[in-house]
Amino acid sequence: MERFRWQVAAVAAVGLALALEALPSVLCWLRAGRRQQQRPPRRQVLFFPSQVTCTEALLQAPGEAPSGPPAGCRCSLPHGESSLSRLLRALLAARASLELCLFAFSSPQLGRAVQLLHQRGVRVRVITDCDYMALNGSQIGLLRKAGIQVRHDQDLGYMHHKFAIVDKKVLITGSLNWTTQAIQNNRENVLIMEDEEYVRLFLEEFERIWEEFNPTKYTFFPQKKTGTSLPPQVSCFGQLVSCHSKCSHHLSQV
């Protein structure tokens, strides 16, 4: 009986020692959880035109975006933060998914960021306007070539949305077209925010358009309307696609 008591006491002592050893880690975990719960949702406003800065550190890093310039960078541009670099950081924070719904997309830096996310295994889906994706300088052809899913409209109205959803948690939206002209010259705004309700509404809109623009539903030779002729066709990445009156003034640029 005495021996049994000693065994119980020994087991209790070992258990107490292990518990005391694990206590700091448990406390850290609890504090981290409390901080996470108390952390206010993200709210960030970016204004453009953006200062021209070097973005190579952001676009070459394989993982987390570094805070400083890449080692040995000889770029003469400033290496500080700018509206463009903050937008890139918000995009490159994606770990699982990225939905893009954009009217015009020709910025090389933003295009590289999207391709980088695709290479990291992030699921990227893009919705865009059929006319502007066919203009010289558009990033859409490069994204498709990289294997990224792209869908576009085929109607008379513009697909004029300008928003992105990161990991189905962060909404990026505003007046900014993702073009060098808009980034460097135009007065524009971008709102980056974590808000479950707004993200849900924008995600529902994305999914609705994504299904509407399913290629199996395309009509490449729409029926002739009364008193009108068939819309002209334009070469779009090796394919002839119907191009309605909204884009006829752009045909010379394709």
Swiss-Prot record:
Region (Required for mitochondrial localization): 1-43
Keyword Transmembrane helix: yes
Organism: Canis lupus familiaris
Entry's localization field: Mitochondrion outer membrane; Nucleus membrane; Cell membrane; Golgi apparatus
Family of the protein in this entry: Belongs to the phospholipase D family. MitoPLD/Zucchini subfamily.
Mitochondrial intermembrane face of the membrane: 1-9
Superkingdom of origin: Eukaryota
Catalytic activity: a cardiolipin + H2O = a 1,2-diacyl-sn-glycero-3-phospho-(1'-sn-glycerol) + a 1,2-diacyl-sn-glycero-3-phosphate + H(+)
CDD domains per UniProt: PLDc_vPLD6_like
Binding partners and assembly: Homodimer. Interacts with MOV10L1. Interacts with MIGA1 and MIGA2; possibly facilitating homodimer formation. Interacts with GK2.
Active-site residues per Swiss-Prot or TrEMBL entry: H160, K162, D167
An annotated GO cellular component: mitochondrion
Zinc finger (C3H1-type): 49-82
GO terms assigned for molecular function: cardiolipin hydrolase activity; protein homodimerization activity; RNA endonuclease activity, producing 5'-phosphomonoesters; zinc ion binding
Domain-related comment: In contrast to other members of the phospholipase D family, contains only one PLD phosphodiesterase domain, suggesting that it has a single half-catalytic and requires homodimerization to form a complete active site.
Top EC class for this record: hydrolase
Gene Ontology biological-process entries: lipid catabolic process; meiotic cell cycle; mitochondrial fusion; P granule organization; piRNA processing; spermatid development
Main localization, broad class: mitochondrion
Documented activity regulation: Single stranded DNA (ssDNA) hydrolase activity does not depend upon, but is stimulated by the presence of Ca(2+) and Mn(2+). MIGA1 and MIGA2 increase PLD6 self-association affinity and affects the homodimer conformation facilitating its phospholipase activity over the nuclease activity. MYC induces its expression and stimulates its phospholipase activity.
Function (record text): Presents phospholipase and nuclease activities, depending on the different physiological conditions. Interaction with Mitoguardin (MIGA1 or MIGA2) affects the dimer conformation, facilitating the lipase activity over the nuclease activity. Plays a key role in mitochondrial fusion and fission via its phospholipase activity. In its phospholipase role, it uses the mitochondrial lipid cardiolipin as substrate to generate phosphatidate (PA or 1,2-diacyl-sn-glycero-3-phosphate), a second messenger signaling lipid.
Protein name: Mitochondrial cardiolipin hydrolase
